[in-house]
């Protein structure tokens, strides 16, 4: 009996040991499977889906008349600046599209994974973001960074003609040329302004020769006509023929696309009355997007900011302010986050939907108009038409214009 009991105990121990061995083998097998190499589009290397598409060829792109650029939002890649695309990678890709004789379409992605998956799906032709050369399914071509970790644009591996054309087109000197161009454009002002702008007749309360038009169309915007005049001076210094490098036109610097949206014929965009009338209509439209701001003067500051920097960017700044415990309906608090939208920590925040913006220009724009409006109110009479009635508060922040 004792011998049988000992034998049974040995069998039991061997069984447990065998179980441990089997478990270890299974775990090792699982770990081996988890280390299977994946393609950039999320399929196992060597699997049925591990195929490399060719994408649209150069001939296809030229026949379609459009090059599709896949990129990320940021100051060095792509961002919207008053309706005009900016950023080093965008400007370079724009030049390449011009070389091909086609239009450029920009598709902004959230991250590298989306860049790669959309390229594979045929939703883009070139990834215009410097990528590290570690994806064998891509052809690296065109733009090349100069740092120690060489990074380049990319197309699909088998799209040889497009890759070769990009390589022949790209020259390292192009980067310096485009950087200089962008720097010049962003630093160029169409007019020189002063906070305390000259009035046509200070003693008579006459701001400009367009006062009658400001008074006529201020009720459309539901603004004080002197605020409309202050904005006009900021935009063009009362020059009806003013035109910015970005294409903004006339007294109120209306972009051609905005003019089309407002029903303003391009043939009339430089005419004072149609230009002011369209601007007043646009201001009224922007105002409806800020009806959640109860205080009227505060609302007008947000409208001014949206006129300059874009409605969606201002809404992003409001979301950031609210997230960080600030009042999203006070411009002096939201303007801090307009400024912060130029830093990655903030323009990549999950509540931000429209990415990077050059916030300093918009903050200075609003400050300049607020100060000028306060000056105009001291000398020019208010019109009888409805408009803003409260006394404007001076801008909290010192602005960049000299007196």
Predicted regions and their residues:
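Low-complexity, Gly/Ser/Thr/Pro-rich intrinsically disordered linker/tail segments
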Residues: 361-403
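Catalytic and substrate-binding regions of cell-wall glycan-acting enzymes that process beta-1,4-linked
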Residues: 155, 301-375
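Export/targeting segments at the very N-terminus of extracytoplasmic proteins
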Residues: 49, 189-238, 273-276, 291-294, ...
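C-terminal motif of bacterial Sec signal peptides marking the signal peptidase cleavage site
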Residues: 26-29
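Substrate-binding/active-site groove segments that recognize
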Residues: 241-267, 275-285, 369
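Extracytoplasmic small-molecule ligand-binding "clamshell" domains
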Residues: 32, 36-130, 166
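Acidic, polar ligand-binding/catalytic clefts
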Residues: 52, 59, 76, 94, ...
């Amino acid at each position: 009996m004792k011998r049988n009991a000992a034998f049974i105990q040995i069998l039991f121990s061997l069984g447990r040991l065998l179980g441990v061995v089997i478990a270890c083998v299974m775990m090792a097998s699982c770990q081996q499977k988890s280390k299977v190499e994946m393609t950039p589009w999320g399929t196992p290397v060597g699997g049925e889906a591990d195929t490399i598409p060719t994408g649209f060829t150069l001939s296809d792109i030229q026949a379609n008349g459009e090059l599709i650029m896949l990129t990320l939002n940021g100051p060095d890649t792509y961002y919207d600046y008053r309706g005009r695309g900016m950023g080093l990678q965008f400007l370079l890709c724009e030049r390449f599209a011009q070389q091909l004789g086609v239009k450029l379409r920009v598709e902004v992605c959230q991250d590298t994974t989306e860049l790669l998956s959309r390229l594979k799906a045929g939703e883009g032709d070139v990834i215009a973001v410097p990528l590290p050369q570690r994806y064998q399914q891509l052809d690296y071509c065109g733009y090349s960074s100069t740092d120690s970790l060489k990074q380049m644009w990319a197309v699909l591996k088998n799209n040889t003609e497009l890759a070769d054309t990009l390589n022949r087109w790209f020259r390292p000197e192009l980067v310096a040329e485009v950087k200089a161009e962008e720097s010049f454009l962003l630093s160029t002002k169409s007019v020189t302004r002063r906070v305390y702008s000259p009035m046509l007749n200070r003693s008579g309360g006459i701001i400009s020769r367009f006062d009658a038009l400001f008074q006529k169309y201020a009720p459309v915007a539901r603004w004080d006509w002197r605020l409309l005049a202050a904005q006009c001076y900021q935009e063009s210094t009362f020059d009806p023929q003013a035109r910015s490098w970005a294409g903004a036109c006339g007294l109120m610097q209306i972009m051609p696309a905005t003019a089309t949206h407002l029903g303003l014929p391009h043939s009339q965009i430089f005419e004072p009355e149609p230009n002011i009338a369209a601007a007043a209509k646009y201001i009224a439209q922007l105002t409806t997007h800020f009806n959640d701001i109860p205080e009227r003067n505060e609302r007008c500051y947000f409208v001014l900011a949206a006129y300059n920097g874009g409605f969606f960017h201002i809404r992003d700044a409001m979301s950031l302010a609210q997230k960080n415990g600030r009042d999203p309906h006070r411009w002096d608090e939201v303007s801090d986050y307009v400024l912060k939208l130029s830093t990655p920590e903030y323009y990549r925040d999950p509540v931000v939907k429209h990415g990077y913006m050059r916030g300093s220009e918009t903050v200075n724009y609003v400050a300049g108009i607020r100060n000028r409006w306060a000056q105009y109110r001291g000398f020019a009479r208010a019109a009888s038409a409805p408009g803003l009635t409260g006394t404007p508060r001076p801008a909290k922040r010192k602005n960049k214009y000299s007196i």
